[in-house]
Amino acid sequence: MEKYNREEFEEVIVDIGRVTKVVKGGRRFRFTALVVVGDKKGRVGFGFGKAKEVPDAMKKAVDDAFKNIVEVKLKGSTIPHDIEVKFNASRILLKPASEGTGVIAGGGARPVVELAGIKNILTKSLGSNNSANVVRATIKALSMLKG
């Protein structure tokens, strides 16, 4: 496992969820956090953390994200070719865009492509828009790009 300098990376919280367990004495809450980390130079990863408190869940998610970092092959400020990838019920379509287009992405795909360092891209989320699966599908697509 490669060690990364955490100062080079930015982190974005994509989703924080709350789960409630009802017990005799009342309700017990637990939290989940989905975090994307990237250095805007072609390295990006995501992590999932669960804990009884939000800050603990976020810390676990960031630690998990550094275990799942992938290298993205860029062509200038965009991607080399079109790609469509399916992860569970989520499908994501990524298309290269000309200079000046910007990042056209929504939901969980936007933080992934921005933190990967892509400046011009068109994305379309097809199928399920579950943010965790969209993030996973986007990272899977970026890792499958051929330079």
UniProtKB/Swiss-Prot annotation:
The S5 DRBM domain, residue ranges: 9-72
Keyword Cell division: no
Pfam families, sorted: Ribosomal_S5, Ribosomal_S5_C
Signal peptide bounds: none
One Gene Ontology MF term: structural constituent of ribosome
Keyword Disulfide bond set for record: no
Swiss-Prot/TrEMBL GO biological process terms: translation
Keyword terms: Ribonucleoprotein, Ribosomal protein, RNA-binding, rRNA-binding
Gene Ontology, cellular component aspect: small ribosomal subunit
Subunit structure: Part of the 30S ribosomal subunit. Contacts proteins S4 and S8.
UniProt comment concerning the protein's domains: The N-terminal domain interacts with the head of the 30S subunit; the C-terminal domain interacts with the body and contacts protein S4. The interaction surface between S4 and S5 is involved in control of translational fidelity.
UniProt similarity note: Belongs to the universal ribosomal protein uS5 family.
Function: With S4 and S12 plays an important role in translational accuracy. Located at the back of the 30S subunit body where it stabilizes the conformation of the head with respect to the body.
Protein name: Small ribosomal subunit protein uS5
Highest classification ranks of the organism: Bacteria, Pseudomonadati, Campylobacterota, Epsilonproteobacteria, Campylobacterales
Primary gene name: rpsE
